[in-house]
């Protein structure tokens, strides 16, 4: 259920099951998600640190992300000097295969900048 909720309208059950199986086989640490959420909550606002970045940056965000609304991606891109923002319509908090080609093009474009 969580996978489907986070994914948005392009959820692929077979892909989600395969990914969950591979993640479980690779590293099963039930307390890990709690530690990760705690670390995120305790880390505070990163805006000032993002402003110090001097590297090509591509911020990728979906319009229907239930975990981090779109304004978070916009704010992140605005905080990083010269960052590019790639917004995927109807994408949740994952990256479905239908967007891979456009993401690859965005990364290639970014890598060609000096």
What positions do the PLM features span?
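Short beta-strand/loop motif that positions the catalytic acidic residue
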Residues: 53, 59-61
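Alpha/beta-hydrolase
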Residues: 1-48, 55, 75
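Acidic catalytic loop of the alpha/beta-hydrolase fold
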Residues: 64-68
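Active-site acidic short loop of glycosyltransferases
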Residues: 54-55, 82
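Catalytic active-site module of serine/aspartate enzymes centered on a nucleophile-bearing elbow/loop
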Residues: 83-114
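Active-site-adjacent alpha-helix of alpha/beta-hydrolase-fold enzymes
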Residues: 71-83
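Residues at alpha-helix caps and immediate loop-helix transition turns in enzyme cores, especially N-
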Residues: 69-72, 99-100
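Conserved catalytic core of Hanks-type protein kinase domains
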Residues: 5, 79, 97
């Amino acid at each position: 259920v969580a996978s489907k909720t986070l994914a948005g309208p392009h959820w692929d059950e077979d892909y989600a099951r395969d990914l969950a199986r591979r993640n479980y086989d690779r590293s099963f640490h039930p307390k890990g998600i709690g530690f990760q959420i705690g670390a995120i909550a305790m880390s505070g606002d990163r805006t000032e640190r993002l402003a110090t970045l001097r590297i090509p940056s591509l911020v990728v965000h979906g319009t229907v992300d239930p975990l981090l609304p779109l304004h978070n991606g916009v704010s992140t891109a605005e905080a990083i000097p010269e960052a590019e923002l790639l917004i995927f319509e109807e994408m949740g908090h994952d990256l479905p295969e239908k967007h891979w080609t456009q993401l690859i093009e965005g990364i290639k474009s970014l890598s060609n900048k000096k």
